[in-house]
């Protein structure tokens, strides 16, 4: 029977918007999607959401490296991420971004409530500062020699050689990763979230029994070592949300990132025109269930900071955190040089999504264990389980039903007791899906598949088909096989969405959890078409080789306006205000005798004439074409004596040089002498 319908909100950790989705990411999104699809099959109201984590120094700097704006970069990355997840049939109801108006408003609301409730503290701290880039440096943007083992080229927070942790100020000969400059110490006022105030609440939440044992044990270690106030602010320049009433101060990315769960759900509610559900799911006394699927590397933020922030701002806490381990490939950490650091899009160029969904699912449990993607075992397991056991069960029976009985199944079950064995397994398999013991569910299903194939082997329909007068037996045997295939595919529906679609088309019926209680009797199926193809190691070899080639391509130097000509050191507004930019009319333009680079421009500033030499001859070989145009000039630049005369200012142009120089022009309506403000 269908259970009492629950309201469930499910999230995956937000992928960072500075890189592509890879197979490590896909473990979590597949795990969550399988669980969500099962919940939907059982009749629950599930909202499944995600978003890109789109703020922080790494995004700001990478955008500069690529020569584009952060907004452009995260927009392009969001499209790529959504394409990858759609390719793996991750059934999100909404995919959003933390760089959104919903997230800004919610971040400001939560911060304001925390501040009003006395949980935000201010104090001055000393940090390493890059004097060339004019920015404070996060720990991972400082490198130097480890103070413990003296290994060179180590990050500012921990040594990858000896494992020591330390402050970036302890590094020997520290250097900025951004500019290579030697950082200096500078003071800055920062805002801190008073996490220790929530220690008692968090310990009670830990002891509630809802969290995984491994998570609860780790949290206990943190409680014993003492909780510390959490720095939630960063100084400009920073790509993120500015803190209310604190010019030049921005929310640290890890403050607004989890709020992105709320922002994405708010966006979904607004799209639906639903003004009720947001509060229904997030209010303090909500009876809806909230689950976060996350990796073990971000447990600290989700088990301490996030529930404390919610508690302190009068929102509900998560029902539970579902934490998983990492992905290794062929028994080792994913490697770019070995071609085992595989992007999601690269995988889909060589294999279908269902194959990886099945392999990951078969290995997952409710524990925080790492999952190894052994590529040879992957090929063998997909072929043995999906092709040989499940799909083959349909193909070896469908031919007889289609050819001999016009696709119509028998009106009675050949073996009702065997069918009951299959349907009785729904409770055990359902509980395994519910409790995220996915590997157990797959083992139970494959044991049934073995039983089904044994039945067909023993009944030998290919022999019966040759015996006169046994048409009814043949129809009954093959109908039984197809009904067992239907039950198996129903149990596998959360895992194999594309194969399920093809199976439903063949069976001519939708696969539902409760529907298997009634077998298909006297039912007409459609002509059988191949449901799934075998895979082989040649595809694996091509996949690995393609991943290696992508690494080579990614290592190629980045070019672009900002990459080739980086933004100069930050200036103050007072410095900028000294530059007087004016609209000027080009009254005359001519070549300069003796120069192959310069044009002589006569400019009208609306009552004052200027003579300006400009190095734009390569871009404007016909100077007469410039006469009558409006442009922008620096009007208060000191006159410069040149071999050809005195230049009384500078016209503004963009471009790398040579023929690629583009004179700037104001919009129509601007008049000579107008100041540019």
UniProtKB/Swiss-Prot annotation:
Q: Give the EC number.
A: 6.1.1.10
Motif 'HIGH' region location, chain numbering: 15-25
> SUPFAM superfamilies from the entry?
Anticodon-binding domain of a subclass of class I aminoacyl-tRNA synthetases, Methionyl-tRNA synthetase (MetRS), Zn-domain, Nucleic acid-binding proteins, Nucleotidylyl transferase
According to the entry, every stretch annotated as the tRNA-binding domain falls at 575-677
User: Mind telling me which GO cellular component terms the entry cites?
Assistant: cytosol
What this protein needs as a cofactor is: Zn(2+)
UniProt cross-references to PROSITE patterns, sorted A to Z: AA_TRNA_LIGASE_I (PS00178), TRBD (PS50886)
Q: Name one GO biological process term.
A: methionyl-tRNA aminoacylation
Q: How does it assemble?
A: Homodimer.
Role, per record: Is required not only for elongation of protein synthesis but also for the initiation of all mRNA translation through initiator tRNA(fMet) aminoacylation.
Q: What is this protein called?
A: Methionine--tRNA ligase
Query: Which source organism does the UniProt entry give?
Result: Escherichia coli O157:H7
Q: Which gene encodes it?
A: metG
């Amino acid at each position: 029977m269908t259970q009492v319908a629950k309201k469930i909100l499910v999230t995956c950790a937000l992928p960072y918007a500075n890189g592509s989705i890879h197979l490590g990411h896909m473990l979590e999104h597949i795990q969550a999607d399988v669980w969500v699809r099962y919940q939907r099959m059982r009749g629950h109201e599930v909202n499944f959401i995600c978003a890109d984590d789109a703020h922080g120094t790494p995004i700001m700097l990478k955008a500069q490296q690529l020569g584009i704006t952060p907004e452009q970069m995260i927009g392009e990355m969001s499209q790529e991420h959504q394409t990858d997840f759609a390719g793996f049939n991750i059934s999100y109801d909404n995919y959003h971004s933390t760089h959104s108006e919903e997230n800004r408003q919610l971040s400001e609301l939560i911060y304001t409530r925390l501040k009003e409730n006395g949980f935000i503290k201010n104090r001055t701290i000393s940090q390493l500062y890059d004097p060339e880039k004019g920015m404070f440096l996060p720990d991972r943007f400082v490198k130097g020699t480890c103070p413990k083992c003296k290994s060179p080229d180590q990050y500012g927070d921990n040594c990858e050689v000896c494992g020591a942790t330390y402050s970036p100020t302890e590094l020997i000969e520290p250097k900025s990763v951004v500019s290579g400059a030697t950082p200096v110490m500078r003071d800055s006022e920062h805002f801190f979230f008073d996490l220790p105030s929530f220690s008692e609440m968090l310990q009670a939440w830990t002891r509630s029994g809802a969290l995984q044992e491994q998570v609860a044990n780790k949290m206990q270690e943190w409680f014993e070592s003492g909780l510390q106030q959490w720095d939630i602010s960063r100084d400009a320049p920073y790509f993120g949300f500015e803190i209310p009433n604190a010019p030049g101060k921005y929310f640290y990315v890890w403050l607004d990132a989890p709020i992105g769960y709320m922002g994405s759900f708010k966006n979904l509610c607004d799209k639906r025109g639903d003004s009720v559900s947001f509060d229904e799911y997030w209010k303090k006394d909500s009876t809806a269930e909230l689950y976060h699927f996350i990796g073990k590397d971000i447990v600290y933020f989700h088990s301490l900071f996030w529930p404390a922030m919610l508690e302190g701002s009068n929102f509900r806490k998560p029902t539970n955190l579902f934490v998983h381990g990492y992905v290794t490939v062929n028994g080792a950490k994913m490697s770019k040089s070995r071609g085992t650091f595989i992007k999601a899009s690269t995988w889909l160029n060589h294999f279908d999504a269902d194959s990886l969904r099945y392999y990951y699912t078969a290995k997952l449990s409710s524990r925080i264990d790492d999952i190894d993607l052994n590529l040879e075992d992957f090929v063998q397991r997909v072929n043995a389980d999906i092709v040989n056991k499940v799909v083959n069960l349909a193909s070896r029976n469908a031919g007889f039903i289609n050819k001999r009985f016009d696709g119509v199944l028998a009106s009675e079950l050949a073996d009702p007791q065997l069918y009951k064995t299959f349907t009785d397994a729904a409770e055990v398999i359902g509980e395994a899906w519910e409790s995220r013991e996915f590997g157990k569910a797959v083992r139970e299903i494959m044991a049934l598949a073995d039983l089904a194939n044994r039945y067909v082997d023993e009944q030998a329909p290919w022999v019966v088909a040759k015996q006169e007068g046994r048409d009814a037996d043949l129809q009954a045997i093959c109908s039984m096989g197809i009904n067992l295939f239907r039950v198996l595919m129903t149990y596998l529906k959360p895992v194999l969405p594309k194969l399920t679609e093809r199976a439903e088309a063949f069976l001519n019926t939708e696969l539902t959890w409760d529907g298997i209680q009634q077998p298909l009797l006297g039912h007409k199926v459609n002509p059988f078409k191949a449901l799934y193809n075998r895979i082989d190691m040649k595809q694996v070899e091509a996949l690995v080789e393609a991943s290696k080639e992508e690494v080579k391509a990614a290592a190629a130097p980045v070019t672009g306006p900002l990459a080739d000509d980086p933004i100069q050191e930050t200036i103050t507004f007072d410095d900028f205000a000294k530059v007087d930019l004016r609209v000027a009319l080009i009254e005359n333009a001519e070549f300069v005798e003796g120069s192959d680079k310069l044009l002589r421009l006569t400019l009208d500033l609306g009552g004052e004439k200027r003579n300006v030499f400009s190095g734009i001859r390569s871009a404007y070989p016909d100077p007469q074409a410039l006469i009558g145009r409006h442009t922008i000039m620096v009007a208060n630049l000191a006159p410069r004596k040149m071999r050809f005369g005195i230049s009384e200012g500078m016209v503004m142009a963009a471009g790398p040089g040579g023929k690629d120089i583009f004179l700037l022009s104001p919009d129509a309506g601007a008049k000579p002498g107008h100041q540019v403000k």
